[in-house]
Swiss-Prot record:
A Pfam family this chain is assigned to: PCI
Name of the protein in question: Eukaryotic translation initiation factor 3 subunit C
Subunit note: Component of the eukaryotic translation initiation factor 3 (eIF-3) complex.
Main location: cytoplasm
Feature: compositional bias, Basic and acidic residues: 823-835
Underlying gene: NIP1
Amino acid sequence: MSRFFVSGYPSDSSSEEEDLLSSSEEELLSSESEEDNFSSDSEFGNDSDNDSSDSDSDGAPSGPTYFLKKDFMKGSGDGSDSDSDDEGRKVVKSAKDKLLDDMRDSIESINTAKRVGNWTNILAEFEKLGRLLIKVGQQKIGTPNFYVKCLANLEDYINETVTNEKESTKKMNATYSRAFNTVRQRVKKQIKEYQSHMDLFRTKPELFETEEPLEGIASTIAGAPQLNGDEDSNAFTSVGAKTFSPIFTTLKQISETRGKKNIDKVEQIQTLEDLLNDTSSTGTPFELISIYQMLLSIRFDASSNQSFMPIDQWKKNEADLNSFLQLLKSKSKEYQVSELGTVTDDIDIEPPANADGVKVVFGSIASLIERLDDEFTRSLQYSDPHSIEYIQRLKDESIIYKLIVKGQLYVESTTPVEIRSKHEAGQLFRIVMRRLEHIHYKPNQLIAANETEAWKNIDTNVDSTIVPRNSDPNDLVVGLADFLTQNAKSIYGKNALLCSIYYYAINNQYVKARDLFLSSHIYSTIHNSESSLQVMYNRALVQLGLSAFKAGVIEESHQALNEIANSQRLKELLGQGFNSKYPSQATTAEKQKLLPFHMHINLELLECVFMTSSLLIEIPAMAAVSSSSKDSKRKASLKSFKSKLDFHERQYFTGPPESIKDHVVHSSIALQKGDWAKAYKLLSSIKIWKLIPDNEQLLSMMKKQLQVEGLRTYIFTYKSIYTKLSIAKLSAIFDIEKESVYSIIDKMIQPGDISGSIDESKSFVNFTTNDHQRTKLQELAIVMNEKVGLLTEKNEKTASNGYSRKQPMQQQQQQQQQQQQQKEQKELLHEENNRFRYANVNANNDEFQTTA
C-alpha cells in the first residue's frame, strides 16, 4: 500500500464512530494488536477474517483499486505489515480525551493569537472554548485545571492591554477594539462564574499544575477525607460553587430560567408565592424586597403573550405592590428601591449603604406601576364597552389611581431635590405624567372625588412636594403640568401642556385653553412628534372647538373643527378606531395605540357641533353673497355645507328629519327664510345635546345665536326690496331688544356689508341703492373685459420674449410694495390657517393607516 495515502489518514481525524467506542472495544483492539502485529485495523476482525487476510497477503497487490486503503473496502480485513511497522500502533481516543485535547488546542491557539495581538482570533477561539466547556459539563468531567489557568492568564493579558492602550499614542483599530471589548466582557463573566476557582488559583497556583481533577484538590484543601462517587462530586460543589441561602437559591434558579422556552411560569409564580408566604415574617428586608421584585415581574411576563393580564393575576399584583410599598415605607431608613440604586454582582449581595446609612436597591417602583396601569388599559381595550363587565372593570380605575399617588409619594421621597430637573429623575417624571393622564379628561367634580378617595388611607403627616394634599382640581392639574413642563424633557412637557389644554377646555375655561394653545406654538412642531402625542394634540384641538361652541364663540369653534371634522380618518386621528381597515385586520400594536372607550370623544356630538356652527356662519354668508353686487365673485367658504343644501333641494320628496344631518339641513332652510323659531325647534330637538352638562344654558346660547343670524340673513336677503325698515318691527320678529337690533345693524353698516344708515331717532334703518344693480349681461361683460386684459398682457410678454412693457420706476415700486404686502398677508393667513390644522397621525411609520 502506498505510504502517501496511509499518512493522509491520521487518528486525529477519525470519525465520530471512533469517539464513541466503548471501553470494552478499546481493550479488545489493544489486546488484538499485542497478540498479533499483523492483524487487521478493522474493529470487526475475527478468526475467519484473520485467515482470509493471511491468504490475501500472500499475493502481490493488483487491480485498479489496489492502492486504496483496505480498511474502507467492504470485506477487507488485512493490514499491510510494512504500513503497520511505519505508522506504529494505532491509538483510539475516548470522547473525553478528545474533548480535552480540543480544549488544549483552543487554548494554544489563544496563546498564539496573544503573541501577535490578534483579538479577532482570540474571540473566535474563546467562543469555541466556551462551547467545548459546555460539553465538558454535560459529560460531568469537571472543570479542567488548564481552563482556569487560561482564564487567569487571559485576565492578566487584558489588564496589561488596557494599561498599554492608555499609555500608547497609537490606538487599536476598530475591528480589534470591538473584539477586545467583547472578549473582556465574556472573560469577566466567566471569572465571576468560576470565582472560587480563580481565588484558589491566585493563592495556590501550584495546585493547578497537575492533571488531577479539581475535585480531589478541593477536597484536600477543605480538610475532608477523600470520597468516592457522588460524595466526591458533592464535596467539590461545596467549594467550587458559591453557597446561597435557601431563599436566594430559589431566586437564583428562577432567575436563570427566565426568558427560556418550555418553562412553566405558573409554577414559578406559585413557588415565589409560597416562598413569600413562608418568609413574610422571618425573612430579612432585603430578601423580601428581592422576592417582591421577582414575583411582580414574572407575573407580568406570564401574561406577555396574552391579550391582557387575567384579572385575578392583576389583582394579586396590585395587592402585592401595595404590600411592597408598605414594606419599603416601614424600612425606609434602612432600604430604598430606586432606579438610582447600584447593581450588585450577584442576587444575594446587598448594595453598600450611602452617607445616610440607607442601602439603595436597584429597582423601579414607577415601572411596576406603569406596567400595572398598561395591563388595566389593555383589559379595557379588549372588553366590550357596552357590557356590564366593562363597567365593573372600570371601577378598578380608582384603585390604580390610589397606587399611582402612593407610588409618586415614594418616588418623591427617594429622588433628591437637586436632581429633579435632570435626566436621572426620569422615574419621577413618568409617574407624575401617569397621574396627570388619569385626571386631565375628567370634570372637576370627578377629580375631587378621586383625590379624596386616594388620600383617605395615607398618613396625614405624609404630603407631596409637587402638589400638596387637599388641592382643588385646578391647582392639581396646573401643579403637575408645571412640574413636567419646567423640569422634564420635551416629550413630557408637550404631553403635560396638551393635558392642561384639554382640562381647561372640558371644564369650560375656553379662554385659558385658547391662550395656552396659541402661546405655546405647539401646532408648529406637532407634525414631527410621535403618534401618541399627535393623538393627544388632535383630542385637545377637538375639545378646544367644543369648548368654544359652548362659550358661544362660533367662528373660533368652526375654525378649530373645520379640517378634522371633514377628515376621512377622524377615528384614527383621535385614537378611537380605524377607518381604513376592519378591526380584525389591525395588528396588536395598532390596537394598543387606541384609547379605552370611556375616554372617547363622542363623534356624533362633534359632527352636530360642527354642522351647527357651519349653519350659523354659512347661511348669512350665502345670503350676503347672493345679494351683493360687489362681492358677486366671492364664494361661500365651505362648499361641503352648501352641497348638502343643494342635494336636499334636488330631492323630489323629503320626509321629516331623522338624523343629525337632516335636522341641521331643515334648520338651515328655515333660517334662510328668516324663520329662526322653526330653526331653533329643529336644532333643539336633537337628542345629542343632552350629553353636554348644563345643556339648558347651551340651548339658550343657540337660541340667541339663531335670532342674531336670522336677523342678519333677513336683512341681507330683503335689503334690495326695502328702502326703510322699522327697528321695532325687526325686534318683534326676531324677539330681540331694540338696542341689540340697533347694535347688530350698525355693525353691518360700518364695514360696508350693507349700504344704509340709521335715522337720528334710532327707529328706522334706511337702505340706499347707490350701486347700480347690474344685469346678468353686464356682469358677463365685466368678466370678459378682465379676461381680455389678461390675454393682452400675455401677448405683450410673448412679443417681447417673456418681458412685459417697461413701466415707469414709480409704478414698479408701487407694484413691488403691493407684492410685498400680499406676501405678508399670505404668510399671516397661512399661519392663521395652520394654527388649527390637525396632526396627521404617524403617517411615516404607518401605525394608524394602511398607506404611508
